[in-house]
Amino acid sequence: MEYEVTKDFDQITLKDDFMFFSVMSDKELCKELLERILDIKIKKLVYVAGQDTKKDSYDGKGVRLDIYTEDSENTVYNVEMQAGKSTNLPKRSRFYQSAIDLNQLHAGMDYDALKNTIVIFICTFDVFKKDFLKYTFKNICMEDKELVLNDATTKVFVNTTATLDDENLNPKLVSLIKYINSETITDEYTKKLDEAVRIKRRSADWRVKYMKYELNLLEREREGEKRLATLMDLLYKEHRFDDMGQVASDEEYRQKLYKEYNIQ
């Protein structure tokens, strides 16, 4: 089968999910990234794992490349680079949160055993169109906005397209964003990131992994096209023309109809 990758391995940067996944598997680089995004100090990361997940994605069919890590203060972090536009990120953050909780809580365990969790998406687009550099969400009471649920869950969406000239912004986060956007080195940390990226590019092993990853994406894209074609054919035969229009643009509704028609 002829195959051509979407981007040459020598050209991928930290904003590409595969390179981000590769570089952030390094505990110290991941630790400082989290510190810059969350504006906190982390004593120690005790566990870092890259999750090349193919069956536990939002729709059960896609590929996830995200980093799962825990610190010494009982907090779990899940961080992912999002370089392509997605209308499902808020619900995907809910899915990731649920998956983390299920992984932690075994039958018979007390809910107090659940750790603090922070789900982070670094997006090369503005999910919420407010030009904030960072959107942080916690569950609050709608009748009293100062009343926080304190369920120990946080979801963060970083917007790399935000205006960066606000003097109130965290300069370390701004430096990170500039590197993600254009590989501009402005401090010691971004220099380390750049060195790590270059090392990965020179690695024959990572080059092969990238080719396999891209091939996997292509195969899954073709599977998705076949499923969509099958669904469209069924909808056409049943004269569900309005549904045909909706599934073309609404992924959540498309997944619902896949289940309705049992299209695997």
Model-predicted regions and their roles:
Residues 159-162, 168:
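Extended serine/threonine-enriched, polar tracts that run as long, contiguous segments within proteins
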Residues 1-10, 14, 18, 77-82, ...:
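Short, charged alpha-helical interaction segments and adjacent helix-coil junctions
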Residues 1-154, 164-166, 251-253, 258, ...:
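Accessory alpha/beta interaction modules
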